[in-house]
Structures are given as structure tokens and as C-alpha cells.
Design a protein with these regions (language model features):
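Active-site rim/adjacent substrate-binding subdomains
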Residues: 1-95, 107, 111-116
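Short alpha-helical catalytic segment bearing the HExxH-like zincin motif
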Residues: 95-103
Length: 118
């Protein structure tokens, strides 16, 4: 999928979130990169866990007025890894949505066990 099309699907996933969540993530940037740093491109036929996305920042449950200024909170989606675990465009769309929701869950302070229920 071309980067522009991938970004459009990410935007659609964000737009599909309920307003009560969208209003709380206005300051969270969602970025798209090919791969995580230091990862070689995924190879066909080599099953392994691939990092699909990552939240960078401080969860809302841990923020304090005493925190030192940092860069903005953001989510990075790794396009090549998402595409590698999907077979069709429909699967890519669904995986983007699931990954966006998962990483934003970390922004809201949810851990991996809590996110399994989402």
C-alpha cells in the first residue's frame, strides 16, 4: 500500500473513534514509519513477532504537574510490519484500527492485560 493510502486509513481509524476519545487525544500525534529502528525488513516465511506500533510518552494516569517538559506524546505505526502480518487490504485496514486503539490504550494508562479485553 502506498504511504498516502496507508495514512488515509490511519486517519479513518482515528475519525471512527467516539468523540469522547477523539477530544482527549488531540495532542497525541500519530506517525507512520516503515520499520522500528534497528529492525531489518520482514522476510516472507519467517514467522516472528513484529512490532506493529509503539506509544511514546507518559500515560495520562502517570502525568503530573511536576513533570519536566518533554516532546509531545505520540504513537508510531510501522507500515511494513503491519503489511507483513496481513494478506489483504481489508486485513490491513482492520490491523491499523486495532493497532491505533491498542497504542492509544497505552496513552490512557492501560497495560497489556487490560488491552486484551478491548
Amino acid at each position: 500500500m502506498k504511504r498516502e493510502a496507508f495514512i488515509k486509513v490511519v486517519e479513518e481509524a482515528l475519525d471512527s473513534l467516539p468523540e469522547e476519545f477523539r477530544s482527549r487525544i488531540r495532542n497525541v500525534a500519530v506517525l507512520v514509519e516503515d520499520l522500528p529502528p534497528h529492525q531489518s525488513p520482514p522476510q516472507a516465511g519467517q514467522p516472528r513477532k513484529l512490532l506493529l506500533g509503539l506509544f511514546h510518552g507518559v500515560p495520562t494516569t502517570k502525568k503530573s504537574v511536576f513533570d519536566l517538559p518533554r516532546g509531545p506524546d505520540h504513537v508510531v505505526l510501522y507500515q511494513k510490519n503491519i503489511e507483513a502480518v496481513c494478506s489483504t487490504e481489508a486485513e490491513i485496514r482492520e490491523q491499523i484500527r486495532r493497532t491505533v486503539i491498542h497504542e492509544l490504550g497505552h496513552y490512557f494508562g492501560m497495560d497489556e492485560n487490560q488491552l486484551k479485553d478491548v
